[in-house]
Structures are given as structure tokens and as C-alpha cells.
Amino acid sequence: MLSKGLKRKREEEETMEALSVDSCWLDPSHPAVAQTPPTVASSSLFDLSVVKLHHSLRQSEPDLRHLVLVVNTLRRIQASMEPAPVLPPEPIQPPAPSVADSLLASSDAGLSASMASLLEDLNHIEDLNQAPQPQADEGPPGRSIGGISPNLGALDLLGPATGCLLDDGLEGLFEDIDTSMYDSELWLPASEGLKPGPENGPAKEEPPELDEAELDYLMDVLVGTQALERPPGPGR
């Protein structure tokens, strides 16, 4: 009886010591825990909790507090392994324009302004060139325009060259016409086949010419033969 009581008392003392040690490891304000990295402290606490759990399971009356300690240690390790919330990235400020960029922008603006002014000048010049010329004022009917008499004909308005041609006459105009295409010599090769044969060839027989007396005789003969061939009438 005494031995059993001493054994139970010893087990209770060991349990109290284990709980005190575990509470020290679970307290983050403890200097040993604060100096130890979190991963090392968590792994050491988990190992110690597992050892205590195995030791209590070997006893006749296991202590469930060691199991609760292991579960809490696992939760703490899982919470420490969760990633920290990612902060949204800070907006990147555009770089300030440099002096070279400002100079290029100013030069481009000056160049575009000069080009625009040149184009406007060109358009103005084109408009002046395309503007209609003022026409001469038409006077009243019968009045000469530009010193030209309204009674002049169309041939008179042609100028002095036409007057010279009219003075020379129409014969000079016809003499200038090229009549070479109308020459008979150009048509000789085409009309050679139409020429009569050589003189030595047989000549065509021409019908004999009859006099008027012979014609009258022939007419009388023809009339007489027709009268003979006609049958006599019933009264004859």
C-alpha cells in the first residue's frame, strides 16, 4: 500500500513538472522562447509534447492533458505557417519628364506650327491662281468690242493671212493640192490584166454593117413569109 501511494505521488509530481515546462514553452514572453526562432521553438515544443504523450499512454491511467497539449501545439505551428496577408502594391509614379524630352516636345511644337503656316500660305497662293479673271465689259449691241467692228465677217476676222490667200485667187489653193495619188500611172499595174491581147493574136470578128436598103429588104421578106404562113379566112 505504501509503495502504491509513493508511486502515485511520484506520477503526480512528474505530471506537474511536465505541465509547468509546457506552460513555459507556450508562454511567448519567456526569455528562452523569445530568443529561440519560432520554427525551432515550435518543433521543440511539439517533440516534448509527443514524448509526454507517449509516457502518459504507457501508464495505467493515461492523462488526456498531454493529448490536448499536442493538439494545441499543432494548431500553433499551423497558424505560424500561414502566409502573411499580401499588401497591395504601391502605385508606381511616372518618372518626371527630363529636360531632353521637354526640349524635343518644344521643337516638335515649333516645327508643326511652321508647317501649318507654310500650308496656309500655299493654299492662299492656289486660291489666288484659281480665281476667275475679270472679263471685259460687254458694251451695248452694235458697239465695237476691243476696237473690232461688229460688221466684219468671219473671213475678215481671220487676219491678213486670209486676205493674202483671197487676193491670190482660188487657183493657188488648188495648185497646192497633191494630185500625185490621182495620176494614171499608179493604176497601171492593176489595170494591166484588162488590156487587150497582143496584135498578133486572133482578132475578134465584128458583125458586118448593113445599109438601109438591105434592112428594108429584110423587113419585106419577113413580112411576106408571115403573110404566107397565116391561114386563109373562112370567106376566102
UniProtKB/Swiss-Prot annotation:
Acts at E2F-responsive promoters as coregulator to integrate signals provided by PHD- and/or bromodomain-containing transcription factors. Stimulates E2F1/TFDP1 transcriptional activity. Renders the activity of cyclin D1/CDK4 resistant to the inhibitory effects of CDKN2A/p16INK4A. Interacts with the PHD-bromodomain of TIF1, TRIM28/TIF1B and p300/CBP. Interacts with E2F1 and TFDP1; modulates transactivation activity of TFDP1/E2F complexes. Also interacts with CDK4. It comes from the Eukaryota. One of its GO terms (cellular component) is cytoplasm. Residues 38-85 form the SERTA domain. The keyword Zinc does not apply. This is SERTA domain-containing protein 1. Residues 190-211 are annotated as: Disordered. Detected at in testis, lung and, at lower levels, in muscle, liver, spleen, brain and heart. Disulfide bonds: none annotated. GO terms for biological process: negative regulation of cell growth; positive regulation of DNA-templated transcription; positive regulation of transcription by RNA polymerase II. Polyubiquitinated, which promotes proteasomal degradation. Keywords: Transcription, Transcription regulation, Ubl conjugation. It holds the Pfam family SERTA.
